[in-house]
Amino acid sequence: MQYKNLGRSGLRVSQLSYGAWVTFGNQLDVKEAKALLQACRDAGVNFFDNAEVYANGRAEEIMGQAMRDLGWRRSDVVVSTKLFWGGQGPNDKGLSRKHIVEGLRGSLKRLDMDYVDVVYCHRPDATTPVEETVRAMNWVIDHGMAFYWGTSEWSAQQITEAWSVANRLDLVGPIVEQPEYNLFSRHKVESEFLPLYSTYGLGLTTWSPLASGVLTGKYAKGNIPADSRFALENYKNLANRSLVDDTLRKVNGLKPIASELGVSLAQLAIAWCASNPNVSSVITGATKENQIVENMKALDVIPLLTPEVVDKIEAVVQSKPKRTESYR
């Protein structure tokens, strides 16, 4: 396992990490979670991602209990959570000072931890002034509830505004963004965010490297495995949007490239994400130990991604974003 600095910070995170979205509390209980988390640690993973909204908070409870039962030292792992959707009350969501402070307290209680290493704004909040959010994030850092803060699914303009406020007030800005990034979703990471990497030292912890499992190659039109994410009732709409003919055609076109390299399609897709130098960590998800073992082998695939192989991939997916023109 390789470890990279999270953006321009001194925090070191494993190049591949594990996230609790969909899995903990939806498909897995504590016993199963313990087995998966230990498989991750055995592979060298030190970064684990969560959110207050995952399984309505149950995902945090399961992760915290599993880590306690496994007897892990808190200082050996990096744990993050995300705040935005906390509950049904008018102040239980968004990025107000009230919800950031109370929401993080709730997350820490569920995790049974004194702090998280990174706390994210799970989405931008158009109803709260950015200055209030920046000040609130600095407050939880100053009070030892978190060490760093970041954003998730924010635009480059929104991140820039947060940094401008932080610099003006001599406060800490967001060191990391968590965007979707895979062979079918590339614009933000490869185009929109380009100025942010050098200007603010922005790090990335990217999610959905397998495009919700589409890039495993296990899905075909009208064929959804019963134990897969798309078989869950809440993900039927996502399945309908994802399993379109053009996407499935491209997936089938990638399979021979993976076969030539002697690797699985999933390993090829994860390695492709991890090979981007601006990506600090690729967040993976799995419901079975063997999936984790196979996913971690993606690290061995990165050296195989020669310019010739990358060109073959590009010829199939045809998803490379055009560089944004600069008029400055």
From Swiss-Prot:
Tissue expression: Expressed in late-developed leaves with the highest expression in the flag leaf (at protein level).
Record keyword Ion transport present: yes
EC annotation from Swiss-Prot or TrEMBL: 1.1.1.-
Induction statement: Down-regulated in late-developed leaves when grown on potassium-deficient soil (at protein level).
GO CC annotation terms, alphabetical: monoatomic ion channel complex
Enzyme class: oxidoreductase
CDD domains noted in UniProt: AKR_AKR6C1_2
Binding site for NADP(+): 21, 27, 49, 152, 178, 207-211, 218, 229, 285, 287, 291, 294-295
Keyword hit for Transport: yes
GO biological process, alphabetically ordered: monoatomic ion transmembrane transport; potassium ion transport
InterPro entries: K_chnl_volt-dep_bsu_KCNAB-rel (IPR005399), NADP_OxRdtase_dom (IPR023210), NADP_OxRdtase_dom_sf (IPR036812)
Protein keywords: Ion channel, Ion transport, NADP, Oxidoreductase, Potassium, Potassium transport, Transport, Voltage-gated channel
GO molecular function, one term: oxidoreductase activity
Catalytic site positions: 54 (proton donor/acceptor)
Subunit (UniProt): Forms heteromultimeric complexes with potassium channel alpha subunits.
Biological function: Probable accessory potassium channel protein which modulates the activity of the pore-forming alpha subunit.
Family: Belongs to the shaker potassium channel beta subunit family.
UniProt protein name: Probable voltage-gated potassium channel subunit beta
